[in-house]
Amino acid sequence: MHIVHSIAELREKLAPFQRPAFVPTMGNLHDGHIALVKQAKPLGDVTVSSIFVNRLQFAPHEDFDSYPRTLDADAQRLEAAGCNVLFAPREKELYPEPQTYKIHPATDLGDILEGHFRPGFFIGVSTVVLKLFSCVYAGKPSGVAAFGKKDYQQVLVVRRMVQQFALPIEILAGETQRAADGLALSSRNSYLSPNERIEAAQLSKALKALGDAARATPTPDLLALEAQAMQALARRGWKPDYLTVRRRADLQPPQGPLASEPLVVLGAAKLGNTRLIDNLEI
């Protein structure tokens, strides 16, 4: 596996290939990232991953400075998974000057849920993803990029951006990888204390219970069910931002009977100092 730190080096390594399969990450890799690499690899003629902790998607009070940087261990895992090129740029390489041109997702998708509780988050995500796509796919007739469904809203934001800009990139949404107790794998799980790690599995259980309740009748009172789910988590010591049932296609609240509507239950809540997100399609 080649490890490159500059855009010029990256493009040189990718020059012989026509269809990169790309997995962008912020590092501190877990089995979910590795599963994405393995899923994407057969869909391209070269497999690329990136590790870059993107300052633009962190608010001033968030964990940019403390986010784990584990490049050597990550590189070993990527190589073992069959990655051919790892792009690990320094901040000055991707942002040699202040990034004044930014991608602002449409408010109906970018300003709800995660976008509401983390203002500017999807602006930072969309901007860095488009920039990474430019680095990886420049001059290529097609490509594939893999993202995990754990970040469900992010997948929709990126997919819509690709459609809006007519980019020749297929977006692969990989299934969420989970621990044996149901906790969605996340780089931020490493922040949890031993007791918090045990409790953290309750988030996926709360989402499943909410989903089951929503599907129990054709016309449920979703607002009441969502409020009850949040109260139940709060009683366990969590600080929930949202637990909600939405349409899969656009993350808007469902209208009318739910029987035929493809839905997803999404949640975000803070346990101690760690904010966790998860979702379940129902």
Swiss-Prot record:
Belongs to the pantothenate synthetase family. Beta-alanine binds at Q57. The active site is at H33 (proton donor). This is Pantothenate synthetase. (R)-pantoate binds at Q57, Q154. It comes from Polaromonas sp. (strain JS666 / ATCC BAA-500). Pathway: Cofactor biosynthesis; (R)-pantothenate biosynthesis; (R)-pantothenate from (R)-pantoate and beta-alanine: step 1/1. ATP binds at residues 26-33, 148-151, 185-188. One of its GO terms (biological process) is pantothenate biosynthetic process. InterPro entries: Pantoate_ligase (IPR003721), Pantoate_ligase_C (IPR042176), Rossmann-like_a/b/a_fold (IPR014729).
